[in-house]
């Protein structure tokens, strides 16, 4: 009697498909080799180690397309199983694909995105020397990189998406620029709308000229908000940064680059990103894998006093006074009539002229957002006492402060023009010393 021979082939095939359906991440990859391609039709994606980020194609709604067709983009998003998909990077934001046809592949040591007619719509355009073969890789931190076969260092890339931010700053990304002029300036630029990733009206950019560096939020070319200068611990105009216990802020200022970045410390379950929204707010957003709902941790401009130059020169904004704009002691409204009508943008003027000598004094204002630094000079070698003496000798000096607040304070910042865009905080601000006429120091 012949026995029954089990059909193991069909059993293994069935088991394979069960595993594929239940555990798709087991078969996911984070690399793209020269003989591979990602296409819209294949619906294939790259998934980062740790399953946090995913790279692939996505489309926006047809109402954003003048010709009524779908617009397709190559992007990176958080890989979550529920909720609204959150995009953190878009390759071809200003050059969409149409007709549901697009291909990403490696060609001549560069990543190239081709449309339906095999015309490039986006490319990394690498022009250096590369050792073939070249591989593209989506890293655990969300950085999409291109590296050659002889690169052994984990942080050496031919090209990386972190050098080309869109509207989102992730941990380990940088905003700023190289001092030698090489590379692009790294800024955040909003989407045109919540469903249109093309370049929008708002940007967040680091001022890298001179010795003091601060971020500006711009609406096209118009300044909307200023963070205040970096003071060794945080940006002076963001006191709440001192309460960001799980975020390590880093500011790099050397002969190679000027840049800001951050990392999330001690709790890798928390995911954090900075986002320049299409409505004009710089947002700090957090979420966890266990609770995928997004939490708006912080957003600015936060209030009226955050608005750029809302009170004009020689005036400061205080959310705890009415009106919120106040002339500095020793100054009066430049236009009293407009001031009474709550139009305070003209600011204030001195009630008594400076004598440019020993007759002048200094008014200490505590918990302040320091004035705009475009008219400031810096001397890192001296402290506050020497800074005061230097300001006394300079008839153009209008005020001074410490450059760095660490270890009791160091460095000298001295203003030689109008003092503008100031505000007073309850806590977390900085001491500012304003030069005033002796008559203004007499108790009223």
UniProtKB/Swiss-Prot annotation:
Stigma. SMART domains: B_lectin, PAN_AP. SUPFAM superfamilies: alpha-D-mannose-specific plant lectins (SSF51110). Residues 356-437 form the PAN domain. Glycans are attached at residues 43, 125, 180, 243, 396. Gene3D superfamilies: Bulb-type lectin domain, Hepatocyte Growth Factor. Residues 31-159 form the Bulb-type lectin domain. Keywords: Disulfide bond, Glycoprotein, Self-incompatibility, Signal. One of its GO terms (biological process) is rejection of self pollen. CDD domains: B_lectin, PAN_AP_plant. Disulfide bonds join 387-412, 395-397. It holds the Pfam family S_locus_glycop. Residues 1-28 form the signal peptide. Involved in sporophytic self-incompatibility system (the inability of flowering plants to achieve self-fertilization). This is S-locus-specific glycoprotein BS29-1. The lineage of its organism: Eukaryota, Viridiplantae, Streptophyta, Embryophyta, Tracheophyta.
């Amino acid at each position: 009697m012949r026995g029954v021979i089990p059909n193991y082939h069909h059993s293994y095939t069935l088991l394979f498909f069960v595993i594929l359906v239940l555990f798709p991440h087991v078969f996911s990859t984070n690399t793209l080799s020269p003989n591979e391609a990602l296409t819209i039709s294949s619906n294939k994606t790259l998934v980062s180690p740790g399953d946090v980020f995913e790279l692939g194609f996505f489309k926006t709604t047809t109402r954003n397309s003048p010709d009524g067709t779908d617009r397709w983009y190559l992007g990176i998003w958080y890989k979550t199983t529920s909720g609204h998909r959150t995009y953190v990077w878009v390759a071809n934001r200003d050059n969409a694909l149409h007709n549901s046809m697009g291909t990403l592949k490696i060609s001549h040591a560069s990543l190239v995105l081709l449309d339906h007619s095999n015309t490039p719509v986006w490319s990394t355009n690498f022009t250096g020397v590369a050792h073939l073969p070249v591989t593209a890789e989506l890293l655990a931190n969300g950085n999409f990189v291109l590296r050659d076969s002889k690169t052994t260092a984990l942080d050496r890339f031919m090209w990386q998406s972190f050098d080309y931010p869109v509207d989102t700053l992730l941990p380990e990304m940088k905003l700023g620029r190289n001092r030698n002029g090489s590379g692009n300036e790294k800024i955040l630029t909003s989407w045109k709308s919540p469903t249109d990733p093309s370049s929008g009206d708002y940007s967040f950019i680091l001022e890298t000229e001179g010795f003091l560096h601060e971020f500006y939020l711009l609406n096209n070319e118009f300044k909307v908000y200023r963070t205040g200068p970096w003071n060794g611990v945080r940006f002076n105009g963001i006191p709440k940064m001192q309460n960001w216990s799980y975020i390590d802020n880093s500011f790099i200022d050397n002969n190679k680059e000027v840049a800001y970045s951050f990392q999330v410390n001690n709790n890798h379950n928390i995911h954090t990103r900075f986002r320049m929204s299409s409505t004009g707010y710089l947002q700090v957003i957090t979420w966890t894998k266990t609770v995928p709902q997004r939490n708006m941790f912080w957003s600015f401009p936060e209030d009226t006093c955050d608005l750029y130059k809302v009170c004009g020169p020689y005036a400061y904004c205080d959310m705890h006074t009415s009106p919120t704009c106040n002339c500095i002691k020793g100054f009066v409204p430049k236009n009293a009539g407009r001031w009474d009508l709550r139009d305070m943008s003209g600011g204030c003027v001195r009630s008594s002229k400076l004598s440019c000598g020993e007759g002048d004094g200094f008014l200490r204002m505590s918990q302040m957002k320091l004035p705009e630094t475009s008219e400031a000079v810096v001397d890192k070698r001296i402290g506050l006492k020497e800074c005061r003496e230097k300001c006394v000798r300079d008839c153009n000096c209008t005020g001074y402060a410490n450059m760095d607040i660490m270890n009791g304070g160091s460095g000298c910042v001295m203003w030689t023009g109008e003092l503008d865009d100031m505000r007073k905080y309850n806590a977390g601000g900085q001491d500012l010393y304003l030069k005033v006429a002796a008559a203004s120091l007499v108790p009223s």
